[in-house]
Amino acid sequence: MRTIKLILEYDGTNYAGWQLQPNGLSIQEVVEGALARLLKEPVRLRASGRTDAGVHARGMVAAFDTDRSIPLRAFSDGLNALLPPDIAVRSADEALPGFNPRFAATGKHYRYTIHRGERRSPLVRLQSWHVRGALNLAAMREAARHLTGERDFASFRTAGCAARTTIRRVDAVEISDDGEMLTVDVHGSGFLRNMVRIMVGTLVEVGRGKLTPEHVAQMVVCPGVVPAGPTAPPQGLCLQKVRF
C-alpha cells in the first residue's frame, strides 16, 4: 500500500468549501471523483484542514492510500487532465504509510488580500476584499502585534466553532502595502474557524479608526468578553502553505 501526498491549488469561488457537503459541491468531492476515475477505485482524501466556501488555496495538502503502481508524475498529470480549470495538482509525492496531513501539520500560512482602489475592480473581485477609503497602516500594524504569541482567541472565532480549546499560537501577522493592494500574512500553529478572517476584519476597523490597537489588546486579555470586529469576506483569503 502506498500513501500519496498531493499539494493542491484552487479557486474556491464556485465551491461550498473543501469538505464534503450534503448540499453543495465541494472541492474534496471533485478531487476524489477525479482520483476515482484515474485509479478505477474509490478514494477518500485526508486533508490538512478545510477551507470555507469562497476561500482559495495555493498549498492545500491532502493524502490518500492506493495499491496502484503508477508513476508519481501520472498522478499529477492524470488528475490535472481530469480536474476543472479552477482546481489543480501542484505536486504528487510519496509519503510515509498512513500519513495524515491534519495531524502531521505543525503550522499554516494564510494570506488575506485587500483591494484599496478608489473603484472596485472586476479583475480582482474574486480574490480580494474591496475596502474603500484610507486605512491607517501604522495603527493596523500596532494592533497586529497584540495578536502574536500564544493567546486565547475566543473573541476571534465564529459561533459554530466546536474547538475544544481556544488557545492558539500566532507566530506573525505581517501587513504589506503594494499601492492599491494590501496583504495580511498570518503564520501560526493552527487556527479557529474564521479566526483569520475575523482578525483581518478587526484590523480593518482599526485602520478605519473605528477601533484602537488598545481595544485589540483587550480582546486577547479578556477573551470572549471584549468583542472582535466583523468577519472579512471569504474571497480575500488564501491558504498559502502548510508546514510539517
Swiss-Prot record:
- The name this protein carries in UniProt is tRNA pseudouridine synthase A
Q: Which terms are listed as keywords in the entry?
A: Isomerase, tRNA processing
Q: Which family does it belong to?
A: Belongs to the tRNA pseudouridine synthase TruA family.
Could you give the subunit structure recorded for this chain? Homodimer.
One Gene Ontology BP term is: tRNA pseudouridine synthesis
A GO MF label: pseudouridine synthase activity
What EC identifiers does the entry list? Answer: 5.4.99.12
Q: What class of enzyme is it?
A: isomerase
